[in-house]
């Protein structure tokens, strides 16, 4: 895998992107469809391609969605630590895009992921079989964006 050089922009600092008003690229739509079908490994592969190729800070939107999804793959595999770490990191990447970006309802994804963090804390690392799977979010589109 090719790793891009470190960008000047870091999540949580400055404006998220001048491109947030643009329509979502095809791979973002595909990755979100995969996320929403519970295909978390596949969404990682799809969104990683978009993230690597994107020079604009909107790449952190892709990275945030990607990491939240990979967190659910970790949960599925019984790795509570990995799930927690990736959800928190993903939320950090998504924070600058609150209010929505490229039609993605970022606020809802953050809130839903935070509910999953709280549920994971409730059941504990050794109680993953009690995790309420109905809390696993979908990435939703803002009204008029789908």
Listing of model-derived features with the role each one plays in the protein:
Residues 1-54, 93-146:
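N-terminal alpha-helical interaction modules that lie
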Residues 80-98:
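TPR/TPR-like (Sel1-like) alpha-helical repeat modules
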Residues 41, 59, 81-85:
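Short, solvent-exposed positions on alpha-helices
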Residues 21, 59-61:
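Residue signature of alpha-solenoid helical repeat architecture, marking inter-repeat boundaries
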Residues 63-65, 78-79:
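Short Lys/Arg-rich amphipathic alpha-helical segments
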């Amino acid at each position: 895998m090719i790793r891009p050089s470190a960008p000047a922009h870091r999540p949580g600092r400055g404006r998220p992107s001048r491109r947030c008003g643009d329509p979502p690229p095809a791979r973002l739509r595909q990755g979100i469809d995969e996320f929403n079908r519970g295909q978390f490994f596949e969404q990682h592969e799809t969104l990683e391609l978009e993230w690597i190729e994107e020079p604009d800070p909107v790449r952190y939107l892709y990275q945030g969605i990607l990491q939240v999804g990979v967190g659910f793959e970790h949960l599925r595999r019984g790795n509570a630590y990995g799930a927690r770490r990736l959800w928190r990191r993903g939320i950090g990447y998504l924070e600058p895009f609150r209010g929505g970006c490229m039609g993605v309802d970022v606020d809802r994804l953050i809130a839903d992921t935070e509910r999953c963090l709280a549920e994971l804390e409730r059941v504990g690392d050794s109680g993953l079989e009690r995790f309420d799977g109905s809390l696993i979010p979908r990435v939703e589109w803002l009204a008029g964006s789908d």
